[in-house]
Amino acid sequence: MKMMSTRALALGAAAVLAFAAATAHAQRCGEQGSNMECPNNLCCSQYGYCGMGGDYCGKGCQNGACYTSKRCGTQAGGKTCPNNHCCSQWGYCGFGAEYCGAGCQGGPCRADIKCGSQAGGKLCPNNLCCSQWGYCGLGSEFCGEGCQGGACSTDKPCGKAAGGKVCTNNYCCSKWGSCGIGPGYCGAGCQSGGCDGVFAEAIAANSTLVAE
């Protein structure tokens, strides 16, 4: 009995340590993370962690592709979604496969716009990412590995701590030396890139590069 209790305690301690380690390496954001925004338009949860899904994009979501209860599409007289969200086949605004996948009525639908090498080098509108499969959108599957153009993600350091390196895609180099978008990167202390709202202007300018 004593041996079982000791083993149970050991397993419990290991689980706690593993959870703590995972939490320590999770990217912080929002109020809990110096008002930093998440990369790739990931959602910042009410607890200040970046991710996708209901736990991050649902109730309390602080920034990124937060879910909304707004109606859109044919179910709402043809209304479109704010913040470049997708309008699902059921007429709700959001982000992810259930909104941007089959039946998507508007926004950065996955099969809506082709780009990159699969489309003769065409660029995506509004600085959306062109995925390795040649479709425009936002999120890690579009802006992560294999991204061909647009606001592709980068984990590269920048600024003084990185020998004066600048961020790609006109991303802002924060005062902490990391690339990203939003007040935490482009606001006070921004070292280079689209500081103080210049990024928004760059996106607007890039929107003229829509493929016909």
UniProtKB/Swiss-Prot annotation:
Keywords: Chitin-binding, Disulfide bond, Glycoprotein, Lectin, Pyrrolidone carboxylic acid, Repeat, Signal. In roots. Residues 27-68, 69-111, 112-154, 155-197 form the Chitin-binding type-1 domain. Carbohydrate binding. SMART domains: ChtBD1. Coiled coil: none annotated. Substrate binds at residues 36-38, 88-99, 140-141. SUPFAM superfamilies: Plant lectins/antimicrobial peptides. Disulfide bonds join 29-44, 38-50, 43-57, 61-66, 72-87, 81-93, 86-100, 104-109, 115-130, 124-136, 129-143, 147-152, 158-173, 167-179, 172-186, 190-195. PANTHER family: CHITIN-BINDING LECTIN 1, LECTIN. This is Root-specific lectin. GO terms for molecular function: carbohydrate binding; chitin binding. Pfam families: Chitin_bind_1. The modification Pyrrolidone carboxylic acid is found at residue 27. Glycans are attached at residue 206. Residues 1-26 form the signal peptide.
